[in-house]
């Protein structure tokens, strides 16, 4: 269970590296490998700064009052299976959207998986709907809008204030500023996203009877989650970095700094209040805002539209995966509880291996991440469009 949770944390790290470093890489403020190394180090530090979001995940999604702790050793196999299948849903969605370079929300993939598994096992009362709506869905809608507005205003002010500065000096100066602003995003990403995995592991520990629901997050959990997300970040999710850095808006350094400062401020504020924001949503909103704030900037609304479609279907798609894997694990588990988990884990490994194999056919790495978007746009956009269309037609009607 802990290994699977840390695997999710790892995919979260490399999937969401683009949130922090895409604009700095796109403008040349940081070399690609230096950028992901810096981001990894700061994600590691950020994971230790707060636990408010971890509390939201641990106690604000699955209704622990509806789960009866088992007798004897206190192990609750139902809760363990809910958590495990939620993680499987989150990991598979992360890998699938990474393959297509779609900056979807790792957080919502995890939440969707947990919600689906909880619904199928405990019914509608098994989900804390107040927490889901108040601390997940509403912030998901408002955060990119707020970030976009802040970023657009900041971009307009930056160009207004520096309008008399020579263009080359302006670009050079803001590149240095981007190093600071990108670092703040990485720090804020650690404070927000690593905590989500901490919350999941905490749920597993509750199921095992190792901790009480009222206890705090153990130190060893914080350390493991911090290391996993840092390692994933260092590996670098180049496909998503490319989409955010080159696919939405052609970004100059002043825009990059404005977008990054807007992203960092929104995420850090939300972490303080325990809001489980998607850093992907915030970063994307900020980047779009820079396109609106700079005169004559080109915004690729087609790419943005496909991202929004992926955002909308992330929760239900991951919930379906979580629910189906729970059913599979549960019914096999009627004969042998461990066997059910093993079968689901094998399916996860096979699916992940296939996705990785597919990614080798169209490699994106530090050497080509900054290539002009038009060089690959038609093939990449068509794949992303097919994914979005397929998922729309396979998602259940409300």
Please tell me what each predicted stretch does:
Residues 393-398:
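Conserved small/polar residues in nucleotide/adenosyl-binding loops
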Residues 1-389:
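Multi-pass alpha-helical transmembrane bundle typical of ion/small-solute transporters
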């Amino acid at each position: 269970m802990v290994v699977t949770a840390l695997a999710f944390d790892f995919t979260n790290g490399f999937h969401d590296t683009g949130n922090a470093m895409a604009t700095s890489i796109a403008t040349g403020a940081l070399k690609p490998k230096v950028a992901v190394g810096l981001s990894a180090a700061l994600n590691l530090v950020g994971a230790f700064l707060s636990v408010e979001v971890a509390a939201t995940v641990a106690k604000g999604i699955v209704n622990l009052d509806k789960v009866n702790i088992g007798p004897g050793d206190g192990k609750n196999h139902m809760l363990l299976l809910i958590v495990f299948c939620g993680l499987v849903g989150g990991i598979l969605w992360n890998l699938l959207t990474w393959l297509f370079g779609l900056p979807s929300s790792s957080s919502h993939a995890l939440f969707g998986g947990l919600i689906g598994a909880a619904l199928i096992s405990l019914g509608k009362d098994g989900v804390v709907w107040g927490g889901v709506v108040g601390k997940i869905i509403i912030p998901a809608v408002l955060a990119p809008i707020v970030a976009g507005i802040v970023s657009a205003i900041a971009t307009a002010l930056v160009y207004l204030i520096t309008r008399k500065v020579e263009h080359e000096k302006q670009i050079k100066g803001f590149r240095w500023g981007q190093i600071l602003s990108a670092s703040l995003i990485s720090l804020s990403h650690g404070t927000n996203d690593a905590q989500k995995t901490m919350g999941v592991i905490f749920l597993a520990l509750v199921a095992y009877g190792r901790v009480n629901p009222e206890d705090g997050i153990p130190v060893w959990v914080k350390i493991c989650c911090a290391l996993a997300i840092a390692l994933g970040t260092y590996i670098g999710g180049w496909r998503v970095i490319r989409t955010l850095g080159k696919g939405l808006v052609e970004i100059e350094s002043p825009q990059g700094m404005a977008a990054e400062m807007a992203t960092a401020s929104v995420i850090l504020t939300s972490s303080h209040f325990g809001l489980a924001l998607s850093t992907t949503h915030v970063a994307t909103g900020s980047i779009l805002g820079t396109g609106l704030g700079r005169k004559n900037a080109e915004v690729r609304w087609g790419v943005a539209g496909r991202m929004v479609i992926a955002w909308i279907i992330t929760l239900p798609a991951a919930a379906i995966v979580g629910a189906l894997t729970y059913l599979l694990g549960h019914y096999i588990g009627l004969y042998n509880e461990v066997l059910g988990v093993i079968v689901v884990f094998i399916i996860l490994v096979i699916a992940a291996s296939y996705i990785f194999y597919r990614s080798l056919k169209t490699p994106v790495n530090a050497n080509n991440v900054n290539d002009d978007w038009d060089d690959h746009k038609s093939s990449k956009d068509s794949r992303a469009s097919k994914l979005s269309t397929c998922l729309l037609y396979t998602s259940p009607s409300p």
